[in-house]
């Protein structure tokens, strides 16, 4: 038997990769973790000459061991194709002494495309492999980015439905339009009267609702998740960190075995966890800088060892990071306990029941590769403007948080290790905030969202992405809204089982 998966809370063991992807969340509410982190078995200098698709196979085959070579290569080929506007898929851009890993060249101009382009193919392949004949209902909470990418990935995929919940006042105008204009007879999106944590908690409750599960199965449905709690989201994200290192090696920017640092703007902790998995696989990564916005629960955690979600929720200009419950941190907690499911489960119950937990000194020592930092909205805007004024390179507000935190980290630590910054969205996904950062409030006056887009393009010389042009005149197809307590009824209504 190849690599298997178990729950971080101990309720499920020896689950195959395909079943873990199909389930999304373990039955006990935990997240699936591989029984071990496999080591890269291709030399880095050989990876340096590989395409993104070839690199993806070499990384993913180590985690998805019950997929055949043909199955996995077929999923990869269907995912990383002309949907991306560059053959490199994830190019690197050097600016102001750092390497920006541009993860926004997919169909929805955000990093979630990197995993959500392949997840539908991994999932439908898994259903065939496991003889599942029920319709798979993808249930997803989004802070703005995952929703559109998931809907685009699953649109009209046979045997699937997708239902996305997002906070009504917690996403950008472009993000909302991208979701509400999404085509596909199997797609639904619902605005909730609450924040992202409310949406995520509501989705998790539905996953754990045994009565709802039985009712769905009786009607021929089965839940799964497209959120980064699904291991099928996490594994594809490891690929681009390996690819980035290999391309730096190929370009002569680093030497074989030379350490790099990685800076990631962080909300739900999935993207930076993928970088950590790459490090555990043998990629020469020294420090992982976890960049937070004003919702700095992760900064406080890495600084004090205490995770406390009982605090004010702040709406910022980097809305996809406006999160107080970072779900994927549970996987790192599990690893830091020595994979003790009882210990990690106890801490997660503390978070659920009391809103906080504290890790031991030994667990903190295990996490010493991580450094936390945060940037205020003002620091974020100033960083975007300075980088643009100095170099002409334009970044979005989430990448701005990362760049700001990196600047402070480098100043305070004196660490001049070559650094990759995860650039997680096109500046046009957050054109209002980016324009305000580089041109001030007067740059926005009298302009609607698309006039701001055009002004930003004229000012920066950066072309407007096709994904934004497509929604300029697209018809709104989705108008559902509900309260936080009505999410289950909304799902049942959409599926016709109410």
What are these regions (language model features)?
Residues 1-498:
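PLP-dependent amino-acid enzyme catalytic core
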């Amino acid at each position: 038997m190849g690599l298997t998966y178990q729950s971080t809370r101990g309720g499920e063991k020896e689950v195959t990769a395909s079943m873990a992807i199909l389930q999304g969340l373990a039955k006990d509410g935990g997240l699936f973790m591989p029984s071990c982190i496999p080591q890269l078995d291709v030399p880095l200098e050989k990876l340096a000459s590989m395409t993104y698709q070839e690199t993806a196979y070499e990384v993913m085959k180590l985690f998805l061991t019950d997929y055949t070579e043909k199955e996995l290569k077929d999923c990869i080929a269907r995912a990383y194709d002309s949907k991306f506007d560059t053959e490199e898929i994830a190019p690197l851009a050097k600016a102001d002494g750092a390497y920006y890993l541009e993860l926004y060249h997919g169909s929805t101009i955000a990093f979630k495309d990197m995993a959500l382009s392949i997840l539908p193919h991994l999932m439908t392949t898994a259903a065939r492999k496991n003889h599942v004949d029920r319709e798979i209902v993808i249930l997803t909470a989004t802070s703005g980015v995952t929703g559109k990418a998931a809907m685009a990935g699953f649109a009209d995929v046979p045997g699937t439905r997708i239902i996305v919940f997002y906070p009504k006042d917690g996403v950008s105008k472009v993000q909302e339009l991208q979701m509400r204009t999404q085509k596909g007879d199997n797609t639904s999106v619902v605005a909730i009267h609450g924040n992202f944590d409310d949406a995520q908690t509501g989705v998790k409750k539905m996953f754990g609702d045994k009565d709802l599960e039985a009712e769905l199965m009786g009607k021929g449905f089965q839940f799964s998740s497209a959120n980064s709690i699904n291991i099928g989201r996490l594994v594809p994200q490891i690929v681009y960190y390996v690819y980035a290192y290999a391309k730096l090696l190929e370009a002569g920017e680093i030497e074989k075995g030379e350490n790099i640092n990685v800076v990631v703007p962080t909300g739900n902790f999935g993207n930076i966890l993928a970088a950590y998995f790459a490090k555990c696989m043998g990629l020469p990564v020294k420090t992982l800088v976890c960049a937070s916005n004003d919702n700095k629960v992760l900064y406080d955690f890495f600084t004090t060892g205490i995770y406390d979600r009982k605090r004010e929720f702040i709406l910022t200009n980097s809305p996809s990071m406006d999160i107080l419950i970072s779900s994927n941190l549970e996987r790192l907690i599990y690893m830091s306990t020595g994979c003790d499911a009882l210990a990690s489960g106890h801490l997660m119950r503390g978070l659920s029941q009391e809103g906080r937990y504290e890790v031991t000194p030994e667990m903190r020592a295990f996490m010493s590769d991580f450094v936390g930092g945060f940037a205020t909205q003002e620091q974020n805007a100033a960083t975007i403007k300075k980088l643009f004024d100095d170099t002409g390179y334009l970044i979005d507000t989430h990448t701005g948080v990362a760049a700001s935190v990196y600047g402070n980290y480098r100043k305070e630590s004196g660490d001049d290790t070559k650094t990759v910054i995860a650039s997680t969205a096109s500046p046009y996904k957050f054109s209002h905030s980016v324009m305000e950062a580089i041109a001030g409030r007067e740059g926005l006056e009298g302009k609607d969202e698309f006039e701001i887009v055009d002004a930003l393009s004229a000012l920066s010389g950066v072309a407007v992405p096709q994904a934004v042009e497509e929604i300029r005149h697209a018809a709104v197809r989705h108008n559902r809204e509900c309260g936080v307590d009505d999410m289950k009824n909304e799902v049942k209504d959409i599926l016709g089982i109410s």
